[in-house]
């Protein structure tokens, strides 16, 4: 029997016996639709606890271990695991970094959510573009339906295989808006008989483009007969991706009420959630998995590897890898890449390169799937020779993701001209490059503070008819912040927020909020804090830390800050507690004591 919680205890990095339950039995989401409890017959499995009961499980199971550490050790653990900001990635992490190395609910969606025909996706993922995909990409942004009508009139046949190819290729390029328009057109024109998987894909795309609330509205319109486990799994994954704890717990409990068996996927989603929000609760989920005899999946191990690596606990990460070996779990390319990234981030160059050589195998050409990660990680190690070696192999006929990885890699190596040359090649080959292509080069300009080139690139992007998506806005906003033009970045944020098709990335707000915080500009820091809520982002410790720092830098009393934290169900870690003490308006000093 596996015991990952024991592995975590051996590394002495998780406080398993002291996790406090904060979930309510009756979670009410104000102003939101409730989920239809009659959508599927319920066969209750009482052995599976609801999510608000999970924390008490760990307290009972490990009560003897609670309180065995000193208060100082407890604080250190809490500070090290409760927030990603305390890790080596720090506050300066960008969205591109996340795309490269971190696990997310979106990263595993093709494999885990099962939204696309599995046999089709595996065979066609690296093949040439489908004709349906080409038609959709070449059409103006809001005219996908007209383009598809014309395509059918020309005698082309719409088949499941062609749809699956196009959908997969659109998703891989993050063209979610076009994919959603295709899905809606297919149903409206009765080109396919809709299945639960089709509706789940629609739900997933709706949330990605229009937000979680619109996704819930979409779910209400889906026929009850199609509201099965796949649909709820998709909703759960999107609640997790949004970092919405209450809604994630609500869906988790709803799945239990509907009689769906507790699965590895469901537990993995809760692990992903707590990896971002409250790492102390990771132990609770692992204990639940042990109690219900749910064997960890490959994603479970990846999450734990990422948690350990992000907090620079390399010995703990290696123990997780050893456990995988003992359990006979084979490392895939993604797990190897994740491990190599954390070795690189910890400055363990030799260990990182050893893993990369294992990824290459005996025949590098035969391991084409690894090229994207190899380019990125070799660049992070400063190995220009290795980046050029890998790129030379695929340069004549590169896959799209390899080209993007090469642009990033050469950018990291300060080879901006090489990055620009690859970009131009993509534009020439595709004729109509996607927003993600522009965003990657734009981020290279951001990293090198090339404001003028960045502006020209965005102008060129707009002239090409390519829609400016969230990743592009994120890079552009950061570009202005890095150039010291914070007010201009704030203006861009306002403009981007008004685009109904775009949900801005959390980092886009934080770049500006951090700058206002450094200035001690309480008014504008509070304004960005409010904008994040309006955009649908739930408050996290990270935002409150920036907000509190603004009050400290302004030497202004932060009245009611503890109550605000409590209202958002956020518990301060060690660094936040120090900020609260520093900014306490009722703080006693030696002089005040004398005056009293």
From Swiss-Prot:
Residues 1-69 form a transit peptide. Residues 62-119 are annotated as: Disordered. GO terms for molecular function: mRNA binding. Residues 72-82, 96-117 have a biased composition (Acidic residues). Its main location: mitochondrion. Gene3D superfamilies: Tetratricopeptide repeat domain. This is Pentatricopeptide repeat-containing protein At1g80270, mitochondrial. Transmembrane segments: none annotated. GO terms for cellular component: chloroplast envelope; mitochondrion. Keywords: Mitochondrion, Repeat, Transit peptide. InterPro entries: Pentatricopeptide_rpt, TPR-like_helical_dom_sf. The keyword Transferase does not apply. Pfam families: PPR (PF01535), PPR_3 (PF13812). PPR repeats lie at residues 228-262, 263-296, 297-331, 332-366, 367-397, 399-433, 434-468, 469-503, 505-539. It is found in: Mitochondrion.
